[in-house]
């Protein structure tokens, strides 16, 4: 099978690492920009926003399957363009990607189909959002409706803080993403991430994880795209997983089909485990980053037949994905100044030495400059390890982190605690 992978982050490096292991793989191409992926796949020098160029590349190189990693191309409708050219795509089309692209769309869908989630109000102006605060106690959650790189959610401890967040969002702090706002009740409980793979009709569980969003130890500082993760999510028991499938995930897939926008790809449910049971915080229309990294470390099934079956409506014929009983832990090394203004250009060495204990270092915000590896983004490296015991996996990951020489980097010391 000839495969094209779209995306250049740590998530895509983990996907590439797993795809490259598949016996079903013939030729593997990936978009350029990640030195780690470049070791595994041939370069596809294409601009992802130029859909015609992507289609042409697929036709010229007899691509059997396109795997889209990040959310932006999904929401931009790249899947639609490829499907229109009869190219199999793993990832939803533009309409179905609204599950991530518009928080208001998802909340309305939940309300219509009785999918458990927090009480909310959609607001189309700062005035409307500020007035909506009268209907909520603090803390209250203020969300930008659109894509904001994992940073468009503010938990406001006071009304003043909530009004400031509303003001910032409507003034363009997250670009067009904040033109509409969702005001939401704050849910008490523990967070967990639940993943499912769907072909638009059939849906199967695809592992669980827990990520750490805040930049600092002890869950302090601003939200980020994620500073680390572990899998499985220990609080998600088999009974809870069954409830999540029955009460949240399966009804969503059925609802999307009924709405005429079948969801193909990975459905990532961000959950709050409340005293009343699991409730949906939000959906993502793709694998999480860095949750993908821990899931790929644990996935035992050959990934390509799964992705291709989902892309071609044949998931029913595939056996359930199997995951190792081992634990996996990812620690993100970020550039100083992240998330506000990460310092670029820092030199990174000793990655091979870091992997000597069995850890895998997935590259994210990196670039090669005359064979010297340098930081080129906020989240730079994702150091991932697996072991039969949770603490052993954690120790292996941190041992590898401490071997890497990257003076401009920092990380949280409490991932998994």
UniProtKB/Swiss-Prot annotation:
Pathway: Purine metabolism; IMP biosynthesis via de novo pathway; N(1)-(5-phospho-D-ribosyl)glycinamide from 5-phospho-alpha-D-ribose 1-diphosphate: step 2/2. Mg(2+) binds at residues 282, 284. GO terms for biological process: 'de novo' IMP biosynthetic process; purine nucleobase biosynthetic process. Belongs to the GARS family. This is Phosphoribosylamine--glycine ligase. One of its GO terms (molecular function) is metal ion binding. Its cofactor is Mg(2+); Mn(2+). Binds 1 Mg(2+) or Mn(2+) ion per subunit. Its EC number is 6.3.4.13. The keyword Endoplasmic reticulum does not apply. InterPro entries: ATP-grasp (IPR011761), ATP_grasp_subdomain_1 (IPR013815), PreATP-grasp_dom_sf (IPR016185), PRibGlycinamid_synth_ATP-grasp (IPR020561), PRibGlycinamide_synth (IPR000115), PRibGlycinamide_synth_C-dom (IPR020560), PRibGlycinamide_synth_C_sf (IPR037123), PRibGlycinamide_synth_CS (IPR020559). NCBIfam families: purD. Keywords: ATP-binding, Ligase, Magnesium, Manganese, Metal-binding, Nucleotide-binding, Purine biosynthesis. Residues 107-312 form the ATP-grasp domain. Residues 206-231 are annotated as: Disordered. ATP binds at residues 133-193. PANTHER family: PHOSPHORIBOSYLAMINE--GLYCINE LIGASE, PHOSPHORIBOSYLAMINE--GLYCINE LIGASE, CHLOROPLASTIC.
């Amino acid at each position: 099978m000839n495969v094209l992978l779209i995306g250049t982050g740590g998530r895509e490096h983990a996907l590439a690492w797993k795809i490259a292991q598949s016996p079903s793989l013939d030729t593997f191409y990936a978009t350029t920009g990640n030195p780690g992926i470049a070791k595994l796949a041939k370069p596809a020098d294409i601009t992802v926003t130029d859909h015609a160029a992507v289609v042409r590349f697929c036709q010229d190189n007899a691509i059997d399957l396109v795997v889209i990693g990040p959310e932006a191309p999904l929401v931009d409708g790249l899947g639609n363009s490829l499907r229109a050219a009869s190219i199999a795509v793993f990832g939803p089309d533009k309409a179905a990607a609204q599950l991530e692209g518009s928080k208001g769309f998802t909340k309305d869908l939940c309300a219509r189909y009785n999918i458990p989630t927090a009480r909310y109000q959609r607001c189309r102006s700062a005035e409307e959002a500020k007035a909506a605060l009268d209907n909520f106690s603090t803390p209250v959650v203020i969300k930008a409706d659109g894509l904001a790189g994992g940073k468009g959610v503010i938990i406001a401890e006071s009304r003043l803080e909530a009004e400031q967040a509303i003001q910032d969002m409507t003034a363009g702090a997250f670009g067009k993403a904040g033109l509409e706002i969702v005001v939401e009740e704050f849910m008490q409980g523990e967070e967990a991430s639940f993943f499912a793979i769907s072909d638009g009709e059939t849906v199967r569980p695809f592992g669980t994880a827990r990520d750490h969003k805040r930049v600092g130890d002890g869950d302090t500082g601003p939200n980020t795209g994620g500073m680390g993760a572990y899998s499985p999510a220990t609080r998600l028991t088999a009974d809870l997983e069954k409830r999540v499938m029955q009460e949240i995930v399966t009804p969503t897939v059925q609802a999307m089909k009924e709405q005429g926008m079948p969801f193909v790809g990975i459905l990532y449910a961000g959950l709050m485990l409340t005293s009343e049971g699991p409730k949906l915080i939000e959906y993502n229309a793709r694998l999480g980053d860095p949750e993908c990294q821990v899931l790929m470390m644990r996935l035992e099934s050959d990934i390509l037949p799964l992705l291709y079956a989902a892309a071609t409506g044949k998931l029913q014929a595939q056996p359930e994905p199997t995951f190792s009983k081992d634990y996996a832990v990812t620690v993100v090394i970020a550039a100083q100044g992240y998330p506000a203004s990460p310092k670029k250009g820092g030199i990174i060495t000793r990655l091979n030495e870091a992997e000597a204990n069995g850890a895998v270092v997935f590259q994210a915000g990196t670039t090669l400059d005359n064979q010297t590896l340098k930081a080129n983004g906020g989240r730079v490296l994702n150091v991932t390890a697996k072991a039969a015991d949770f603490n052993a996996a954690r120790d292996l990951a941190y041992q590898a982190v401490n071997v890497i020489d990257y003076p401009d980097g920092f990380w949280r010391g409490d991932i998994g605690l």
